[in-house]
Amino acid sequence: EYGFTITKRRDALAQLQAEVDVVIIGGGQSALATAYFLKRKKVSFVILDDQSQAGGAWLHAWQSLRLFSPHTWSSLSGWMMPTTEHTYPTRNEVIEYLSAYEQRYQFPTIRPVHVDHIEQEDDYLDVYAGDQYWRAKAVVSATGTWSKPHIPNDIGREKFKGIQLHSADYVNAAPFKNKKVIVVGGGNSGAQILAEVSKVAETTWVTTTAPAFLSDDVDGRVWFLRATERLKAQQEGRSLEQLAGGLGDIVMIDSVKEARTRGVLHSREPFVAFAEHSVVWADGSTQAVDAVIWCTGFNPALNHLRGLGVVEPDQTVAVHNGRSMKLNNLWLVGYGE
């Protein structure tokens, strides 16, 4: 009750900044894609982004990260990503493109603004950020997942006295030189970080299942085909037994191919426990470890929506075609499936 009183008192003192048709929360690629179509339809909107500049999650990605598809398949609506130096665009090239895209269309963007909660007010949604708020007929949440890294908590990792970090906080391989490192996770981030760290450290790759590699001549374009086929099937009310593009998840970009030539793209089953300076495998054997890099994915960043009663116990929001099923003027984009 005390916390509720304080919240209401703060809100009563908050200053209305603007009334618009739509508030977009987040400033990454999903937010920009949404903004493009709102502007085309002449819908009034504002983007509230908690970053200091354009680029979204890419601002925090590790230095060597690359897109998994060529620039021609990685563009937003209206303006193609310029030709890049390499087949797969680099982190900096993506940031430059997103920044230029935002400037090109002159989207009304305010940053840094951290939205802490939203309240319903009659038919409107009031979007609060500290002592400021924006009133909207609808809200598009595009906060993504990068700020909510997922790390398994059921194996006693608090016992481990070595280095632990998530891929969200990984920058480059330098801190791991000459160390014994375990990379956990069988997706693209795990493969890319393993490829880089294995050049300077003794590495072990841990995955729950055998890594699934795409063929060398197949890239991230296959994911677009899969997503399109899945969406079409959903709209037509049918199920898919085999998705387009064949098997595999890990894109064989140059750094991963190079790691293959060094024989490091082999993994083993997950360890079952931590000790202070080692991990314990299922057979009871131990392995000395200096650092663990968790490439274990992310959860949706939904804290700002909790006061609306739309976040389910499994920490998701039930949607149909991107629209909240509990609140019809709330939309979510860019969170994956």
Q: Model-found features: residue ranges?
A:
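Flavin (primarily FAD) cofactor-binding/catalytic cores of flavoenzymes
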Residues: 1-27, 33-51, 55-57, 86-337
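Aromatic-lined carbohydrate-binding/catalytic grooves of carbohydrate-active enzymes
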Residues: 53, 62-65
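Short, flexible helix/strand-to-coil boundary loops that buttress conserved ligand/catalytic motifs
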Residues: 58-62, 69, 217
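Residues that flank catalytic or metal-binding motifs in active/ligand-binding sites
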Residues: 63, 72, 123
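Glycine-rich flavin
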Residues: 67-86, 234-236
